[in-house]
């Protein structure tokens, strides 16, 4: 006998520093490599890599509210109504320090300029990723406001 289909998805986000997020959701949107991917309860099992971007979670305990989380890449596994996200880094929008993110953006822009002048392709790539991460944090924080 089959149990009634659930309409709740558990979303867990973990980084090397520990659990960043753990809530029930009606829907989850993640920045997959192939584009934005929406996940709801009873989704087929899937494992997918994630890019630097914003995760959006529509929570079941507050239907009008959507949580935003900035991630710096990782992967997601969905199985049995649990979405487990393992990310290199993740920060909830409410926890992002905007001035710190803006300083990181400025440092990355300066590093891009220096690396370009030195023709240092490795340093340039690292600086471009740092800029992408800083811009993502700024965008996610601004999305909250």
Curated annotation (Swiss-Prot):
Membrane protein topology class: Peripheral membrane protein
Main localization (coarse): membrane
Transmembrane segments: none
InterPro entries in the cross-refs: ATP_F1_dsu/esu_C_sf (IPR036794), ATP_synth_F1_dsu/esu (IPR001469), ATP_synth_F1_dsu/esu_N (IPR020546), ATP_synth_F1_esu_C (IPR020547), ATPsynth_dsu/esu_N (IPR036771)
GO cellular component: plasma membrane; proton-transporting ATP synthase complex
Compositional bias segments (type: Basic and acidic residues): 106-123
Subcellular location: Cell membrane
Residues covered by region (Disordered): 100-123
Pfam families (UniProt xref): ATP-synt_DE, ATP-synt_DE_N
Keywords: ATP synthesis, Cell membrane, CF(1), Hydrogen ion transport, Ion transport, Membrane, Transport
GO molecular function, one term: proton-transporting ATP synthase activity, rotational mechanism
Domain of life of the source: Bacteria
Gene3D superfamilies: ATP synthase delta/epsilon subunit, C-terminal domain, F0F1 ATP synthase delta/epsilon subunit, N-terminal
Family to which the UniProt record says this protein belongs: Belongs to the ATPase epsilon chain family.
Assembly and binders: F-type ATPases have 2 components, CF(1) - the catalytic core - and CF(0) - the membrane proton channel. CF(1) has five subunits: alpha(3), beta(3), gamma(1), delta(1), epsilon(1). CF(0) has three main subunits: a, b and c.
Its job: Produces ATP from ADP in the presence of a proton gradient across the membrane.
Official protein name in the record: ATP synthase epsilon chain
Originating organism: Latilactobacillus sakei subsp. sakei (strain 23K) (Lactobacillus sakei subsp. sakei)
């Amino acid at each position: 006998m089959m149990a009634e289909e659930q309409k709740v998805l558990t979303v867990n986000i973990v980084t090397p520093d520990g659990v960043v997020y753990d809530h029930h959701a009606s829907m989850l949107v993640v920045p997959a490599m192939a584009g934005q991917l929406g996940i709801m309860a009873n989704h087929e099992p899937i494992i997918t890599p994630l890019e630097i971007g914003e995760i959006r979670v529509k929570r079941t305990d507050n239907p009008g509210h959507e949580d935003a989380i900035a991630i710096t890449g990782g992967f997601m596994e969905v199985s049995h109504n649990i979405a487990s996200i393992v990310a290199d880094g993740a920060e909830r929008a409410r926890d992002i320090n905007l001035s710190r993110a803006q300083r990181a953006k400025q440092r990355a822009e300066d590093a891009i300029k220096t690396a370009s002048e030195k023709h240092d392709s490795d340093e340039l790539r690292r600086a471009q990723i740092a800029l992408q991460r800083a811009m993502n944090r700024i965008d996610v924080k601004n999305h909250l406001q």
